[in-house]
Amino acid sequence: MTTAQKPLKETAAQWLGLNRATVAVLVVIGCLGLSEEVWSNFLALHLNDRTGSILRAAEYTGLIYSATNLLEGFGYIIGGRIAHSMGARLALAISAVPMSIGFMIMLAADSPWAIAFGSVLMTNWEPLSVPATFDIVGSEVPKNRRTIAFAVQSIQKRLPKVIGPAIGAAAFAAIGYWLNLTIAFGLVGVAVVLQLFLTNRMQPKGKTSPVPFRTIMRDMPRELRMLLSAEVFIRWGDWFVRGFSGLYVLNLLITEYHWEKSSAIYAVGWLVAITNLTALATYIPIAKLVDRSKSPRPFIGLTFLLFAVFPVSLVMMPRFATAFGLPVIVALGFTYVVNGLRELGEPARKALIANGFPPAVRARAVGLYWGLRSFAFFPAPLVAGYLWARIGPDATFVIASVIGLMGTAWYAVSSKAAARLS
């Protein structure tokens, strides 16, 4: 490497908030994320095959996602405690354990209840790892580079969401769901090997003092309390549609537009990929714009608004397309682009949270923040499954948008109050 090349590479790494620790985290998150995306987007379709009823599949889906959110609440808090007391390396290693157990259950079982139990375990790698990633970014990356560092992490999480659904759709349509699980289980093995190799460069955690939860709650900044309360509304609306959108689109294309099932499955996979490609295109430019802005609040508010718009768009856009003689897939593609644009403010929101807590308690505080959020909205998918069966998916999705708009309005009011106080 020449002298001229070295500063250029160092500058690029610094510009992106990259160093050894953050690169190790990116690799681990990327592998585990790809593993999840290969199977999770097709879980509702697999349950539909197993139960033989779209309503039963919706009920199981609601139960699974409610249990997942409840367990995630504990996972975030436990992950924060591990990262605080034992360090990020151990927290990242432990995050792969429940996923591995879940895969073994899913591969061995055929009962919808066993599938539900295994899938809940499989989705809980992220809450165990999130406090560690915040701790690493907060301690290893300068404050003026944290938004871009979170944007790079978001890209690394989104890349699997682009590749995974395409791989999963091909596997599910060609062979069956067991192939999705087998591919995903293999990716977990790759993640564990890379994790052991890459994270040995991370410094061990020094001695830390225990921090009571009541102290963290008492010292949580007012702005973060307001953000948390608004997020609860947003996540309630989001979870009314998140686990059900693939099932909704599949049923729409097959029953109303008479698509072949295999073609509809491929469409679901590619629509998810469109969402994630859209999000990928926004992360870096928006993150740099946020870094240069006086406040991240407008970007967060726009994100919340787009969260609220997606469910009602999923209901209305296909009808508009039919009325104007356009292919339904064009309307669905536009809707999923809107769904991808809602990630505009995610790096800004994460940077706001990371900057809001002092370094000594950051990992534990982030775990508590995420945990409280998960506890608050964990019933949402269960309620959505109930409403789907009682009043239908269209009405359920409209209710989701109303809840999201309530959260957006509350954040707009509370952020103005926070701006006046700052």
Which residues are covered by each model-predicted region?
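Helix-loop boundary and gating motifs at the non-cytosolic
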Residues: L8-L70, L224-V272
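Hydrophobic core of transmembrane alpha-helices in multi-pass small-molecule transporters
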Residues: G30, G102, W113-L128, F324-L344
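Residue-level signature of mid-helix packing/kink "hotspots" within the transmembrane helices
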Residues: N69-I77, K161-V162, N276-I284, F377-F378
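Structural signature of the two symmetry-related core transmembrane helices
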Residues: L90-I105, P298-S313, S401
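Cytoplasmic helix-loop-helix junction between adjacent transmembrane helices
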Residues: G118-R158
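Symmetry-related core transmembrane helices of the 12-TM Major Facilitator Superfamily/SLC fold
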Residues: N180-L198, T396-A412
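C-terminal transmembrane helical hairpin of 12-TM major facilitator-type secondary transporters
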Residues: R297-G345
